[in-house]
């Protein structure tokens, strides 16, 4: 009796772990480009409940596509109900950015958005790529 209970418990834990691994799978993002900025080699995931706040995780290469213009580049990401969070890149370089964005009041998020922009200063508006929308 005791051995069968342990076997059932072990099988249940294994299947729970396998289910979490599938929910935590990374998906490919399309390459995004706008004047002066490129977001490439992107992957994203929607974390399951109780894992990294159930948030939206992403890892991308952010490239300053026009080194001569003197402008910085950045990634913006947000989840439902919250404003954009900004993650800066570097001028004249390609940097790897890996972050999580989440709603601290919820077990998990269902919708997330991401885009890349070029910071053109305070007098001119920034130009951004199209916004990608990801759903759980």
Predicted regions and their residues:
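Secretory targeting and sorting signals
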Residues: 1-23
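Post-signal peptide N-terminal regions of Sec-secreted extracellular proteins
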Residues: 24-136
């Amino acid at each position: 009796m005791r051995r069968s209970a342990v076997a059932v418990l072990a099988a249940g834990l294994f299947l729970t772990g396998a289910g979490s691994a599938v929910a935590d799978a990374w998906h490919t993002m399309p390459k995004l480009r706008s004047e002066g900025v490129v977001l490439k080699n992107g992957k994203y995931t929607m974390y399951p409940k109780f894992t990294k706040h159930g948030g939206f995780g992403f890892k991308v290469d952010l490239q300053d596509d026009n080194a001569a213009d003197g402008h910085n580049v950045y990634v913006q990401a947000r989840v439902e109900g919250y404003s954009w969070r900004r993650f800066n890149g570097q001028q004249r370089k390609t940097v790897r950015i890996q972050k999580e964005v989440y709603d601290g009041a919820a077990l998990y998020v269902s919708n997330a958005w991401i885009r890349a922009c070029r910071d053109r200063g305070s007098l001119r508006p920034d130009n951004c790529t199209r916004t990608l929308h990801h759903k759980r």
